[in-house]
């Protein structure tokens, strides 16, 4: 609720909020609003294991394989899809049942997330990264 209140001040800007913690799915609905892209490493607050999603989400921005439309820029949607696929593959490779289900919400079936780019120098996405004490990405503003 605190983050939702903080972000309510941004009424004309697009906001990307990435929560890669375990049980981060609980953030999804309170944070969702028009003009926001919310990415969580888990689908629900009940998925409480350590998450692999952040490693792959960050790696996506440095891997040409994540640039699915081959436009030279990796959107938040492309990074999300890349990371989700990598998590699934990692679980399968280890023979584990998939217990981590990343979620993306942007009130438009991924359309806004497909047009927001991070770390590319494009002026349509000047965002900052919030890193927690353990070096994990906890928010992109």
Q: Residue spans of the language-model regions?
A:
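Catalytic-core segments of thiol-dependent peptidases
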Residues: 1-22
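Active-site-proximal C-terminal subdomain of hydrolase catalytic domains
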Residues: 15-107
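Extended acidic, low-complexity intrinsically disordered regions
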Residues: 140-141
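Acidic, glycine-anchored loop motifs typical of Ca2+
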Residues: 1, 67-76, 94-125, 129-130, ...
């Amino acid at each position: 609720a605190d983050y939702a209140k903080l972000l309510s001040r941004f009424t004309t800007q697009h906001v990307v909020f990435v929560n890669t913690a375990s049980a981060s799915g609980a953030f999804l609905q309170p944070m969702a609003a028009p003009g926001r892209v919310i990415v969580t490493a888990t689908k629900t607050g009940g998925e409480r294991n350590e998450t692999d999603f952040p490693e792959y989400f960050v790696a996506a921005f440095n891997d040409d394989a994540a640039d699915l439309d081959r436009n030279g820029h990796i959107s938040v949607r492309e990074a999300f899809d890349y990371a989700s696929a990598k998590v699934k593959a990692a679980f399968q490779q280890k023979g584990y049942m998939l217990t981590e289900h990343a979620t993306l919400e942007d009130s438009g079936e991924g359309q806004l997330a497909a047009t927001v780019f991070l770390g590319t120098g494009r002026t349509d996405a000047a965002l900052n990264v919030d890193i927690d004490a353990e070096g994990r990405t906890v928010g992109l503003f």
